[in-house]
Amino acid sequence: MALTKAEMAERLFDEVGLNKREAKEFVDAFFDVLRDALEQGRQVKLSGFGNFDLRRKNQRPGRNPKTGEEIPISARTVVTFRPGQKLKERVEAYAGSGQ
């Protein structure tokens, strides 16, 4: 089950005490700042959570799965995420609990 932006705003409403409009604006603003930083080519480091980086992928050969024809896959920039140690530990503890 995925966590949505609407659910994040609802949790802020429930746990922090922001009203629903403020909570939605807060979540939207957070992702706007994250997106803007990445668009500017900047790394985003969230202490205790992880890092978002941009990585350049060179052009490479690919294959059309329907025809088998070889086609080039264009060079591009992709966003990568590396979880921080605290996040890794919490996920591993949760996964180890059998839930």
Swiss-Prot record:
Keywords tagged on the record: DNA recombination, DNA-binding, Transcription, Transcription regulation, Translation regulation
Gene Ontology molecular-function annotations: DNA binding; structural constituent of chromatin
GO cellular component terms attached to this protein's record: cytosol
Protein name, per record: Integration host factor subunit alpha
Organism: Xanthomonas campestris pv. campestris (strain ATCC 33913 / DSM 3586 / NCPPB 528 / LMG 568 / P 25)
Record GO biological process: DNA recombination; positive regulation of metabolic process; regulation of DNA-templated transcription; regulation of translation
Source species, domain of life: Bacteria
Family: Belongs to the bacterial histone-like protein family.
PROSITE patterns: HISTONE_LIKE
SMART domains: BHL (SM00411)
InterPro entries assigned to the protein according to its UniProt record, in alphabetical order: Hist_DNA-bd (IPR000119), Histone-like_DNA-bd_CS (IPR020816), IHF-like_DNA-bd_dom_sf (IPR010992), IHF_alpha (IPR005684)
Described purpose of this protein according to its UniProt entry: This protein is one of the two subunits of integration host factor, a specific DNA-binding protein that functions in genetic recombination as well as in transcriptional and translational control.
Quaternary structure, from the entry: Heterodimer of an alpha and a beta chain.
SUPFAM superfamilies cross-referenced by the UniProt entry: IHF-like DNA-binding proteins
CDD domains (alphabetical): IHF_A
NCBIfam families given in the database record: himA, PRK00285.1
